[in-house]
A protein has these predicted regions:
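Charged, glycine-rich active-site and insertion segments that engage polyanionic ligands
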Residues: 1-88, 92, 99-106, 111-167
Length: 167
């Protein structure tokens, strides 16, 4: 489905505001089911966003004890959910980097994601994006290979502390 058609359908059928309909249509990329999933308030992506925000804030503040607690929470998720969460983290990393270019056509974020990215994006730059992306990819691979989730996520959190400081 074309983005404009989906926007119109979301506005008419779901009574969304035009700006919200535009965002969801862009994120869904022609997939009506994905658009409806985005509208669901209990969306898994909302939980992933909360976990991403918590990770980045705790890493920035260097709160090792709280990062350990964050890791313990993540370890209770199933492996497939952990992998989906890491995919979401990679999505947020890309979107935060693209936000730095100040071109809305490059960005595919919900309003909540953009609210976080407008303050967070300055910490994602050319000096650290590749290493952070590789870190998320490696963590996903290790989880897929049945590694201990607590060790993988705590190691990842500690490395994020160092990588966020790169300018």
């Amino acid at each position: 489905i074309e983005t404009a058609e989906m926007e119109k359908a979301l506005t008419e059928r779901r009574a969304l505001e035009p700006d919200m309909a535009h965002r969801i249509a862009r994120i869904a990329n022609g997939n009506w089911n994905l658009a409806l999933e985005e509208l669901d308030a209990g969306n898994e992506n909302r939980q992933h966003l909360d976990m991403f925000i918590m990770l980045m804030r705790l890493a920035y503040m260097r709160k090792i004890g709280d990062l350990k607690k964050w890791t313990d929470v993540i370890a209770t998720f199933g492996r497939e959910k952990q992998k989906r969460m890491l995919d979401y983290f990679m999505h947020m990393l890309r979107e935060s980097f693209m936000y730095n270019f100040r071109n809305p056509e490059l960005s595919y974020m919900t309003q909540d994601e953009e609210n976080f990215a407008k303050n967070f994006a300055r910490f994602i730059n050319e000096a650290n994006i590749i290493d952070i992306s590789n870190l998320f990819e490696d963590s996903k691979r290790m989880i897929s290979q049945n590694a201990n989730a607590k060790i993988v996520f705590f190691d990842m959190a500690l490395k994020i502390i160092v990588l966020l400081l790169r300018k």
